[in-house]
């Protein structure tokens, strides 16, 4: 049975002090959250140790927002799997549309990052998704399939999360219709050929649409951006009830 992963990606938000305040509000709100789901937070690198400290003994798991494929070396601005593990990190987001866009990350580089994560017992959250232009040209499925086939090459699907994030829905307030998101997630599962693969949806996820999204048969969680910065709103997402 696929256990949903509810993950919040804080991006370049939250200082250590803000992280402590956020957790002080959030933790009491998940005291009765069912055990049938994982709860994950991806803070900035600077707040990882703070989150680990404040969240010690809680059910909150930690993700990094990226990971490098080398264990050490002259890679300014990067971070290795071992460095993350030292702080209790369990997951690593790779292939998010922002580094794809701003740093021209290729599917090959994303695959290297994901392989490195798995080799060091981290669970990669591999992001895929089409732009508005690609969608309007009818290229969405082709683009996503290429990202899946190249980005997931050589990975163990049992130790992997895929996040379908249509780029046009990230931070825009636009949400992919639940049925369409479910259809794409089902296609991804069929392309990978693993019925147990965990597939998230991401893109303007909020308390108002979480129940409907989690009621879809092929959506196994969400990767939440802006809405995860509000501890009360993210707690509502964590406490979803299938619509």
From Swiss-Prot:
SUPFAM superfamilies: Triosephosphate isomerase (TIM). It catalyses: D-glyceraldehyde 3-phosphate = dihydroxyacetone phosphate. It comes from Synechococcus sp. (strain WH7803). This is Triosephosphate isomerase. Pathway: Carbohydrate biosynthesis; gluconeogenesis; Carbohydrate degradation; glycolysis; D-glyceraldehyde 3-phosphate from glycerone phosphate: step 1/1. Involved in the gluconeogenesis. Catalyzes stereospecifically the conversion of dihydroxyacetone phosphate (DHAP) to D-glyceraldehyde-3-phosphate (G3P). PROSITE patterns: TIM_1, TIM_2. The active site is at residues 96, 165.
């Amino acid at each position: 049975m696929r256990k949903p992963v509810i993950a919040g990606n804080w991006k370049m938000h939250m200082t250590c002090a803000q992280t402590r305040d956020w957790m002080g509000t959030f933790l009491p709100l998940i005291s009765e959250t069912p055990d049938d789901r994982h709860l994950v937070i991806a803070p900035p690198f600077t707040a990882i140790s703070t989150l680990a400290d404040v969240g010690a003994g809680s059910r909150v798991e930690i993700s990094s927002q990226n990971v490098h494929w080398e264990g050490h070396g002259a890679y300014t601005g990067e971070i290795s799997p071992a460095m993350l593990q030292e702080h209790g990190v369990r997951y690593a987001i790779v292939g998010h549309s922002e580094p794809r866009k701003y740093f021209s990350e290729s599917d090959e580089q994303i695959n290297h990052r994901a392989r490195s994560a798995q080799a060091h017992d981290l669970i990669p959250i591999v992001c895929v998704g089409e732009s508005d232009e690609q969608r309007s040209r009818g290229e969405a499925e082709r683009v996503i399939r290429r990202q899946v086939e190249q980005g997931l090459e050589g990975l163990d699907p049992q130790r992997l999360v895929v996040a379908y994030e249509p780029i046009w829905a990230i931070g825009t307030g636009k949400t992919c219709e639940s049925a369409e998101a479910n259809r794409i997630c089902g296609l991804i599962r069929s392309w990978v050929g693993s019925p147990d693969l965990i597939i998230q949806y991401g893109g303007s996820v909020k308390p108002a649409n979480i129940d409907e999204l989690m009621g879809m048969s092929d959506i196994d969680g969400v990767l939440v951006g802006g809405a995860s910065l509000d501890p009360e709103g993210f707690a509502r997402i964590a406490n979803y009830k299938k619509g």
